[in-house]
Amino acid sequence: MAVLKGTLDLLVLKTLSWGPRHAFEITSWLEDRSGGRLECDDSALIQALHRMEAKGLNAAEWGVTENDRQARYYRMTPSGLAWLRGQGDELARDIAAIGAVLALKTGK
């Protein structure tokens, strides 16, 4: 399934909380950790990375991949960590509330 609308920035920052990564590594990390359930569109990911960089939530620098290719590596900034903590907690509460409703017996 595609990443749910409004969650991409949060998921990308969660990925970057585990260390700097280039775009392909971010996509792979999300797919691996979600058991293949989350798929991230490449163009949406790049737009999100640039948007978050403009907000100071991440920073980027050029590096070399394990295949000797140039790639932009993204890392989370302290502002990004603060944003992740606040938004992550809020989303976790929202998911728990939705889960509580869905766990109810179906009427009629």
Where are these regions (language model features)?
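A cross-family signal for key residues in well-ordered alpha-helices
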Residues: 14, 28, 47, 85, ...
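Accessory beta->alpha helical hairpin/"wing" motif in late/C-terminal subdomains of nucleic-acid enzymes
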Residues: 76-80
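Beta-hairpin "wing" of winged helix-turn-helix
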Residues: 53-70, 75
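Basic amphipathic alpha-helical segments that dock to polyanions
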Residues: 45-52
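N-terminal helix-turn-helix DNA-binding core of bacterial DNA-binding proteins
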Residues: 1-44
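Amphipathic alpha-helical dimerization/coiled-coil segments
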Residues: 82-108
